[in-house]
Regions:
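Extracytosolic ligand-binding ectodomains
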Residues: 1-119
Length: 119
């Protein structure tokens, strides 16, 4: 996406020595964060417990959590506060657990990538 959170993630990644805009970097970051937060909520690293809590972590209602706010999110979850993890990619799941998503339509102009639109 081209959201504020995606830009924040890219800047944060660059500050820490990563490219920040490579394929699936934001998605990988978000997947790891969701697992960590679901473990915190479940109080367990058991895969069934994680799976049972991911959608609660990722979807509203709750305090929105962006990239770089994992420590804050862990504290909120530990305190029993609902969160709505947005992360780097605007994480959201459907009722059956499928990722809602968007994608960029890109073109190359003058040797550089240009976004045509986000769908």
């Amino acid at each position: 996406t081209e959201s504020e959170d995606a830009t924040k993630f890219a800047e944060m990644a660059k500050e820490n020595g990563a490219q920040g805009s490579g394929p699936y970097q934001g998605e990988s970051y978000d997947a790891a964060a969701l697992m960590i937060l679901a473990m915190q909520k479940a109080g367990s690293a058991d895969r069934g417990s994680i799976a049972g809590n991911v959608m609660d972590i990722a979807n509203a209602p709750g305090e929105q959590i962006g990239p770089g706010e994992l420590a804050k999110a862990l504290e909120l979850v530990a305190a029993g506060t609902d969160i709505d993890y947005q992360g780097a990619t605007g994480v959201e799941f459907t009722d059956v657990g499928e990722a809602k998503g968007s994608y960029k339509q890109l073109t190359i102009e003058d040797g550089a990538w240009k976004t045509v639109q986000v769908r």
